[in-house]
């Protein structure tokens, strides 16, 4: 490390342009690097190898956003032991070994990114929020040890089952939109969940989610559901999406006291639902999209 106000000779000062405040480019010295900057937020678009290597001089960085195109080597990030929030998008990554043993990362957001090996995610047991959007995922075995997760976003992948989630008892928010899932049975014991986005899957049976008494938001649009009788037991539901399914009878929703919004676009309901139940729901002040 250089002394005084001299930065390390291999420090890429273009990083300064990426700090969170767009109206102020900070003057960085070696003293400042050594002493803190505990709330550093860096956003890099198509980072160069020099920029990534320079991040090792910012050990107190807490939040990092990388927007990339093409291959990227993230090994230089292994020294960022205080990193709490990491976002990566549009990259090709061989692995995420740099996170192995990290005890600080609480929020990880990886989207539109190809990763050859996800196994090191299993060591991030302190994670509270995980987003893996459009990452070509077809296996969740690595995720079963992340028991403290509260928010999980897995949309636009190739998942067929959710078995790996069946012991994630802290989970409150789950987004599995745009997969190939046909069974929600693995969620039956996750009674803390209050928000599920499960549109664009192959779900036909919703009986397995009746134990989820805290559900306030449920989106099942673009599935194969025909019977919504089980939903009548989810008395905390406020928002429900059942658009583009095979539902004929909407009457089970009459018993939901907190319901405020229903999306039924593309469904062909029977005469009784069209003439009686839907008007009655609207009369209660419920917004219905049809």
Predicted segment positions?
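Short "repeat-start/strand-capping" segments in structured domains, especially the N-termini
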Residues: 60, 81-82, 103-104, 125-126, ...
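Ankyrin-repeat and related helical/solenoid repeat scaffolds used for protein-protein interactions
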Residues: 214-271
């Amino acid at each position: 490390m250089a002394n005084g106000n001299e930065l390390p000779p291999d420090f890429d000062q273009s990083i300064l342009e990426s700090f969170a405040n767009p109206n102020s480019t900070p003057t960085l010295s070696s003293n400042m690097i050594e002493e803190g900057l505990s709330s550093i937020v860096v956003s890099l678009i198509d980072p160069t190898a020099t920029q990534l290597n320079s991040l090792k001089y910012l050990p107190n960085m807490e939040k990092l956003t990388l927007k990339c195109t093409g291959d990227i080597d993230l090994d230089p990030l292994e020294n960022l032991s205080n990193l709490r929030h990491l976002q990566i998008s549009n990259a090709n990554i061989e692995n995420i070994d740099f996170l192995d043993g990290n005890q600080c990362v609480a929020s990880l957001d990886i989207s539109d990114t190809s990763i050859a090996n996800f196994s090191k995610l299993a060591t991030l047991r302190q994670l509270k929020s995980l987003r893996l959007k459009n990452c070509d995922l077809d296996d969740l075995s690595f995720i079963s040890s992340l028991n403290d997760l509260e928010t999980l976003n897995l949309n636009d992948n190739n998942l067929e089952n959710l078995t790996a989630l069946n012991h994630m008892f802290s989970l409150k928010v789950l987004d599995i939109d745009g997969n190939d899932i046909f069974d929600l049975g693995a969620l039956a014991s996750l009674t803390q969940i209050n928000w599920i986005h499960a549109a664009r899957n192959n779900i036909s049976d919703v009986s397995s989610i009746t134990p989820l008494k805290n559900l306030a938001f449920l989106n099942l649009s673009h599935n194969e559901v025909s019977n919504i009788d089980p939903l009548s037991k989810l008395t905390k539901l406020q928002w429900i999406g059942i658009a583009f399914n095979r539902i004929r009878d909407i009457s089970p929703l009459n018993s939901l006291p907190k319901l405020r919004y229903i999306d039924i676009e593309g469904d062909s309901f029977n005469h009784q639902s069209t003439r009686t139940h839907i008007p009655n729901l609207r009369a209660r002040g419920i917004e219905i999209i049809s």
